[in-house]
Amino acid sequence: MERIKELRNLMSQSRTREILTKTTVDHMAIIKKYTSGRQEKNPSLRMKWMMAMKYPITADKRITEMIPERNEQGQTLWSKMSDAGSDRVMVSPLAVTWWNRNGPMTSTVHYPKIYKTYFEKVERLKHGTFGPVHFRNQVKIRRRVDINPGHADLSAKEAQDVIMEVVFPNEVGARILTSESQLTITKEKKEELQDCKISPLMVAYMLERELVRKTRFLPVAGGTSSVYIEVLHLTQGTCWEQMYTPGGEVRNDDVDQSLIIAARNIVRRAAVSADPLASLLEMCHSTQIGGTRMVDILRQNPTEEQAVDICKAAMGLRISSSFSFGGFTFKRTSGSSVKREEEVLTGNLQTLKIRVHEGYEEFTMVGKRATAILRKATRRLIQLIVSGRDEQSIAEAIIVAMVFSQEDCMIKAVRGDLNFVNRANQRLNPMHQLLRHFQKDAKVLFQNWGIEHIDNVMGMIGVLPDMTPSTEMSMRGVRVSKMGVDEYSSAERVVVSIDRFLRVRDQRGNVLLSPEEVSETQGTEKLTITYSSSMMWEINGPESVLVNTYQWIIRNWETVKIQWSQNPTMLYNKMEFEPFQSLVPKAIRGQYSGFVRTLFQQMRDVLGTFDTTQIIKLLPFAAAPPKQSRMQFSSLTVNVRGSGMRILVRGNSPVFNYNKTTKRLTILGKDAGTLTEDPDEGTSGVESAVLRGFLILGKEDRRYGPALSINELSNLAKGEKANVLIGQGDVVLVMKRKRDSSILTDSQTATKRIRMAIN
């Protein structure tokens, strides 16, 4: 107060006013503030007073020879004064206009290539459709979004190397282009930019736009893919939204969308296999999305989604430190807790062992259609503020928060037994049991929760157990807000560990993700996903499993044949036969397997009964753990097309049909490939022809190593001996001839010799 009086007093004296308004600014601190550093302190003011001058622009001296001194209107374009501090001349803004209208033209061929992202944007906007404007309250939440459509997904460092290599190829400096995408892009751009006259700096800027994902943390209601974000200013305001359909898609959005679908399919499939983690890795490494290896995409793509993050964790990549529960991303914003095991009783007197979080904590919850702020203490919900698109979404968020709070009244609201299982038929953990139970029906939960009178708070409203809004009453601690809750902004990534059941933990041991959190939503991928792993054969149903299994045997017949005769157990345990088991009726799997294995053993023991077609046909059945029984079968059943279909042990059937003349195999009418050798011609044809140049010495001799296939014989040196597997599944010892002259007689004697060696 005293200071203010004093200042008023000073200002009333005319001399003070004069000093303050007339004296020059020569205080060192002020001069320092406006002159130190390269950063302009008041850019708009600087621009205004610069442009008010007659010659605010400097240009190279050569410009005076290229531009007249005055334009058609007689206005001066450049000054005879040179710029202080450089050897450039001062020019008027009118000079720029003259240059743009009358200056030299250059080739424009490179413009669409360099400014590709801009040209494509114009096309998208031209073909996009803008719908009506609606006036309504916009629940926007800040999300990290991709702001530049049409980019590749290189890291900043990778992009920098590519740009240097393309724009300044002769500059020194270590550049290592390693990834597939780096090499492809570099080659492509170098070809595109031959004889390009656009300034290298501009080219570098534009390349960066094309190669690197740029993200911003922006308030969004609605679509978050980059083709919507580029028109954010046109589609949503504070109280209005305009409908818009993009006029084109961009690859980066398609990659994100397809990656999520592939990851979900892979995690779901891995969760039900014997070793989920190993299976998941095997599938990630053998899958391609739009022709790019999935593991390469995972390394570069920052998409945060539960399944994608599980795949990243398995590959040892860092992921976000937030955790997932009930499809919501939780981020603790304050407080802390310790965990303790506690046994609780449900309303049905079932005992559950839950890990209780003791302590006060605050969380933000962000879901696809609803967001919330949650404050909780040990097994008690203090406050939940929810906002969402509709009643259904708000209810989902409330259920998740109530279960997460671990309150007793929630556990007591359970009616009936909790016995939910995951895809692998294992019981879910207690927290997910509770979640599933209430997601099915939350009526009792909401009724038992309790209600309270509420104060009138701006922008907040109560919600009753039947989900109707109210200004007087609300479920205890629960309020609905008009404002959304922002997504967690930090892009920090943390080191995590993953166990064999795909549970992802942070370094303090908190579970961040588990397969239960992976969405069951099915979608159609925008880019082709190629799963090479046999584990994914079943994604397209039983028929695909059947066709793929037999195709695999035929493609690998050479090695399968050797294993069949020498190491059958190893062959039966191959993972490629795993999907097939789901087609065989459970009750009879073991008997089928025992029967087929016995049959195969007889084939090995009784010479000349080797039958390729039959081995291929029955092999997948031998993969199940065998039951010893004396049962004989003339046909084996597989469940496809919604019913049991029969595969005949001897002969063709609609399921498995081998055509001797064309040597083609059809499975359920679909082509499954050609057999390279005819199963029924005995040894005479193939073997005698192939064994030209080899002398048959007699029966198999183990000292010469495992049996080679006929194709592998060509690698032998002259005089070298080896065991070789011939058509009947029999093994004989051969030696490569030292001279070529006697080759002709081989084919005649081979047939006789083979018979002798075998018998």
From Swiss-Prot:
Q: What InterPro entries does the annotation carry?
A: Flu_PB2_2nd, Flu_PB2_6th, Flu_PB2_C, Flu_PB2_CAP-bd, Flu_PB2_middle, Flu_PB2_N, INV_PB2, PB2_helical
Q: Which UniProt keywords apply?
A: Cap snatching, Eukaryotic host gene expression shutoff by virus, Eukaryotic host transcription shutoff by virus, Host gene expression shutoff by virus, Host mitochondrion, Host nucleus, Host-virus interaction, Inhibition of host innate immune response by virus, Inhibition of host MAVS by virus, Inhibition of host RLR pathway by virus, Inhibition of host RNA polymerase II by virus, mRNA capping, mRNA processing, Viral immunoevasion, Viral transcription, Virion
The intrachain disulfides are none
Q: Where is this motif: Nuclear localization signal?
A: 736-739
> Is Magnesium a UniProt keyword of this protein?
no
Where does this protein reside within or beyond the cell? Virion; Host nucleus; Host mitochondrion
How this chain assembles, per its entry, is: Influenza RNA polymerase is composed of three subunits: PB1, PB2 and PA. Interacts (via N-terminus) with PB1 (via C-terminus). Interacts with nucleoprotein NP (via N-terminus). Interacts (via N-terminus) with host MAVS (via N-terminus); this interaction inhibits host innate immune response.
Please describe what this protein does: Plays an essential role in transcription initiation and cap-stealing mechanism, in which cellular capped pre-mRNAs are used to generate primers for viral transcription. Recognizes and binds the 7-methylguanosine-containing cap of the target pre-RNA which is subsequently cleaved after 10-13 nucleotides by the viral protein PA. Plays a role in the initiation of the viral genome replication and modulates the activity of the ribonucleoprotein (RNP) complex.
Q: This protein is called what?
A: Polymerase basic protein 2
Protein species of origin = Influenza A virus (strain A/Leningrad/134/1957 H2N2)
